[in-house]
Amino acid sequence: MHIMEGFLPWQWCLVWWIIAIPFIVMGVLELRKLLKQDREYLPLLGVCGAFIFILSALKLPSVTGSCSHPTGTGLSVMCFKPYITAVIGFVVLLFQALLLAHGGLSTLGANMVSMAIGGPIVGYLVYKLLKNTSVIYLSRSSALQP
């Protein structure tokens, strides 16, 4: 769920921005390096951004009276790793704040840490952990049978 504009005191907004900025910088550096090697990644970057934008714009009602939504960063993090996904997430969250009023500019740092940095890092770690695991083993271990 996006943190709305004006919800956080300015001191906390600053703290979240200080945490988010290094990820954006590292992501931009990795993105520049990737695109210098091969510009063919541009369409895939666009698809990942569109996927995140569409999926995170879907609202699912929750019991508490607010709503939740998937972020869709898993696809991007499997293709481009966490730093580049942070840049894609930043662009998506910026567009959502400006066009859909989901979140705000002052709370963009906090929204980034939760949706464009934290989630993708966890997703990437799970992906790396399970990447070489057999599909049959995973399906057996995830089956809900007594």
Question: What feature does the model see in each segment?
Answer:
Residues 2-10, 22-75:
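Hydrophobic transmembrane alpha-helices
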Residues 10-20, 109-117:
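Structural signature of hydrophobic alpha-helical transmembrane segments
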Residues 28-32, 55, 60, 96, ...:
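Membrane-water interface at transmembrane helix exits
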Residues 33-36, 77-87, 133-136:
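Membrane-helix interface "capping/anchor" motifs
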Residues 42-47, 86-90, 113, 139-145:
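Hydrophobic alpha-helical transmembrane segments
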Residues 46-53, 79, 119-120, 144-146:
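Small-residue-rich segments of transmembrane alpha-helices in multi-pass membrane proteins
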Residues 56-120:
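Alpha-helical membrane segments and adjacent membrane-interface helices in multi-pass membrane proteins
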Residues 115-146:
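Short helix-perturbing small/polar motifs within transmembrane alpha-helices
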